[in-house]
């Protein structure tokens, strides 16, 4: 079944009492029970009834179930940001004395999360180039908790061989955790490439309008967590089984104790976003490819970076994994940082904003914003030069966007 049909025919196990075609927004902090036993059953996990809105909400559960059916996952947890999804995933698998082997080409806050936040909890960060599988494998030891990377890095747009990474991870008894935000699940099926845990900033493509923050934590339910060096996960396997330990820890410990469940308002907006996701993705990614091709002819632009371009070093690998439309983001390099800033300042249609995959096209200077707290030397190590401008392409007419780019580079 095609995505466009599948997404519109997924059915929730508990339909609305009034037969509403759209799931209602349950704006409530608490839920009433018919008797003391029903209340106890909900709080102790003997029933699926929501106990308190910090832990579960019917509107949020509806979004989780729809994504689970669409992706074929075992479970989905909807959180209030993409960073929360990453933080929960890495916290769930790690612990003091363990290490995480992560890509050195990550989003700036992901780097800080692993290096600073998890590092302060006693987790050792090991950053390496994930486009070089042999270097990844060399960093693994018996204290490694997981491998973590972005399927296409932001903003470098590097592409790793996902199946090769999966083979390495599984040969060592490790889970492969992937941030798939830049290419959504209508175009890329992470489970088919051996990804065990998928994290998505649903703020981006799924929301589509830049109206709400959200993150999805998707567990494909295939990894044997009894192999994990984490005592917390080993303990969970004895209670819920080898394949459910991760989700059990996320839902019954991390969500309950730390909060961060997605709000029902955002969950409602994202269920609507799912319905049109495939259509919007094809339009936006198609425009990105066309614009990247046109920008190659502009002499003021020194380099155009998009993995869908045939002269891109990652073109063949990108096409094999993501097809001919690997997302709606590309970057351009100008003569200098000053030229990059001047270009951004002159834009008239493309907005100056930090989000990705909004319906509106957006531009940002990564080195001075999302990587602005890193030193120039650190930015260079992460391949984020000051000459780069990142463009996220929206739904505007591509011809108008090209004219905007042309006038801004002059």
Named regions from a protein language model:
Residues 12-14, 27-33, 204, 221-222, ...:
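Glycine-rich beta-alpha junction loops
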Residues 1, 97, 115-116, 121-124, ...:
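PLP-dependent enzyme catalytic core of the Aspartate aminotransferase-like
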Residues 1-26, 217:
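Short conserved active-site loop signatures built around small residues
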Residues 48, 74, 213, 266-270, ...:
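Short amphipathic alpha-helical segments
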Residues 289, 295, 300-389, 393:
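Conserved C-terminal alpha-helix-loop-beta "cap" of PLP-dependent enzymes
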Residues 30, 35-87, 109-117:
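Conserved N-terminal alpha-helix of the aminotransferase class I/II PLP-enzyme fold
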Residues 40-46, 347, 405-408:
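Short Gly/aromatic-enriched secondary-structure transition segments
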Residues 7-13, 75-297:
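Conserved PLP-enzyme active-site core in the AAT-like
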């Amino acid at each position: 079944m095609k995505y466009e049909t599948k997404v519109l025919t997924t059915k929730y196990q508990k339909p609305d009492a009034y037969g509403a075609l759209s799931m209602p927004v349950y704006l409530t902090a608490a839920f009433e029970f018919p008797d003391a036993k029903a209340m106890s059953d909900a709080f102790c996990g003997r029933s699926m009834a929501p106990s308190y809105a910090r832990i579960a909400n019917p509107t949020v559960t509806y979004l989780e179930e729809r994504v689970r059916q669409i992706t074929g996952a075992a479970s989905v947890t909807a959180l209030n940001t993409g960073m929360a999804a990453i933080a929960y995933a890495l916290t769930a698998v790690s612990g003091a004395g363990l290490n995480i082997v992560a890509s050195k080409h990550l989003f700036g806050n992901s780097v800080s999360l692993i290096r600073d936040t998890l590092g302060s909890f006693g987790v050792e960060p090991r950053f390496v180039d994930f486009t070089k599988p042999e270097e990844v494998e060399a960093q693994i030891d018996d204290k490694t908790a997981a491998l973590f990377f972005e399927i296409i890095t932001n903003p470098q747009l590097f592409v790793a061989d996902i199946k090769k990474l999966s083979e390495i991870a599984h040969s060592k008894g490790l889970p492969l955790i992937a941030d798939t935000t830049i290419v959504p699940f209508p175009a890329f099926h992470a489970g088919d490439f051996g990804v065990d845990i998928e994290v998505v900033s649903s703020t981006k493509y799924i929301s589509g309008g830049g109206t709400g923050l959200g993150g999805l934590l998707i567990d494909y339910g295939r990894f044997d967590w009894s192999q994990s060096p984490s005592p917390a996960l080993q303990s969970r396997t004895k209670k819920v089984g080898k394949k459910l330990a991760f989700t059990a820890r996320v839902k019954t410990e991390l969500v309950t104790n730390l909060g961060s469940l997605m709000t029902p308002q955002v969950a409602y907006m994202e269920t609507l976003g799912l319905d049109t996701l495939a259509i919007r993705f094809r339009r936006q990614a198609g425009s990105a490819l066309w614009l990247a091709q046109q920008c190659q002819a502009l002499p003021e632009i020194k380099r155009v970076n998009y993995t869908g371009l045939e002269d891109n070093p990652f073109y063949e690998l990108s096409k094999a994994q993501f097809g001919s439309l690997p997302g709606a983001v590309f970057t351009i390099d100008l003569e200098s940082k000053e030229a990059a800033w001047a270009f951004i300042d002159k834009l008239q249609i493309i907005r100056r904003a930090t989000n990705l995959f909004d319906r509106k096209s957006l531009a940002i200077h990564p080195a001075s914003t999302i990587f602005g707290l890193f030193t120039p030397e650190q930015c260079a190590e992460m391949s984020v030069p000051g000459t780069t401008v990142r463009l996220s392409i929206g739904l505007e007419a591509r011809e108008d966007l090209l004219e905007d780019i042309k006038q801004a580079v002059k």
